[in-house]
């Protein structure tokens, strides 16, 4: 057998191994990732990626979705700011920094997150004061509400262990847990008198957390809940 023939055979074996790998990954995905949904692509500045997108990678984030009834209560209370700020369509609480994964990493990442949080006890999310936050580029200001539940810090610590196992960045050292409600790109840093919220009126118990990777959202059930 010539050197050329040996090289061609090696390439064929390599191609077969690659096909087997993709088949195995597809089987794993169907087994471990049943709760996922395709969402309509919407222009929502609250979820715009700040990190540059690389070809072959899927931008991702892990977050808690704020229920519509809680969102409506908060937006009613902050209606006075609507003349100067534009509303953000879907309210959420970020639990990780933005990150990127390659396609073959996605099944294992989702599996690891689900494994970590399935025993995490149910807790109540409460809100505190409103605050104005600037983005890193200093060109957009967000009207945000503080999240005051101490349990959410433990949840972030737990997710940090998953992030590090995939060589991804941990959450910010200076933790300002919040949900952005509205934004503006003009008259930045203009002072406002911001109000507080009654914890009893604006609170909820999350049953799940979400993982968004590209346009697909995966649902992960928190411990003490069933779906």
Question: Predicted segments — roles?
Answer:
Residues 1-227:
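Histidine-dependent nucleotide/RNA phosphoesterase domain, centered on the 2H-phosphoesterase fold
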